[in-house]
Every structure is written in C-alpha cells, then in structure tokens.
Amino acid sequence: LEVISSLNPIPGTIVKEVTKMEKMLVRGVTKDNDVARISIVGLTDVPGIAFKIFSKLAAKNINVDIILQSVGRNNTKDIAFTVSKDNAPIAIDAIRELAFVGDDTPITCDTDVAKVSVVGAGMETHPGTASKMFEALFNSDINIQMISTSEIKISVLIDAKDADRAVAAVHEAFL
C-alpha cells in the first residue's frame, strides 16, 4: 500500500508488513560503570526533604539518575540516589551543608555498583518487559539494588562485579 498526495507528484509512504526488527521491543542493552550510590538514612519524614536535597545537588550541577525513597516509618524515611563517581564526594559535601542533615545522619556511598539498562520504544505499554529482565538477572543470581523505568528504558543498579554477566544474561533474554 502506498499513501500519496493527489496534489503532489512526489513518491508517497509505503505501508508494508512489519519486519522482525520492528517487532523487537528491546533494541539494546547498556552498561554504565561510572556510577555511585549515595544513601541517606533516617531523614525526618516531612514535606520538602526531597526537594531540598535535590535542589542543593542541582545548584552544584550534579546530575542525579536513579532515585529511591523508602516508605516512611516511625516518622523517618531513607533516600538513595545515583550520581557519577566523580560527583559523589561533592554530593555528600552538599548534603552535609543542609541544616536538617546532622553530623550523625548516616550517609553512605558505594562506588562498586553499575547500571544495566534495556532500551527500546514503548516499554510502558508492553506488560512483562521488566519481569523478563528481572528473570534473566535472577537466573544469573544477580541481585537488584535499585530500579528505574521510563517509556524507553528500564535500568537496574547492581554490584559492579556482576555487570558483564548481567549484560550477557539480559542480552540473551531479549535479543
């Protein structure tokens, strides 16, 4: 089928059968070893804490990727997020500058992590994509520390030592 304009003699758009590549939901698997996870434990569970933390990091020009906030309990919550390894010390110093973060507030930084992602179009409208990725990691005995999703990407944070095995397992599952 060709869709053309009756007013313009140029060739139109050919509509044809979907190819195997067009049927593939996941188009690639990526790995990022330049990642650090920062965790802040026991923050008071009140409005504005996340805003204050992440606006402070933005003011220092620190890009934040994956963010995880725990469900509040006993009027406290934990926040963990990832930044580049180079920005981790700057991020920790910036957080320590905040008035509500005391010297005794536990802040940890783990640089022995990696981010593995599957990339493709329309993932949020295809049930089971995340499950398939998580199954591939489970079958390879790889623990997931954090998860982030978007319409085109599902990312997990894992131990850096498992990154190459994770890429291979996820690649095998999808591609």
Task: Explain the meaning of each model-derived region.
Residues L1-T149, K153-L175:
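C-terminal catalytic "cap/lid" subdomain
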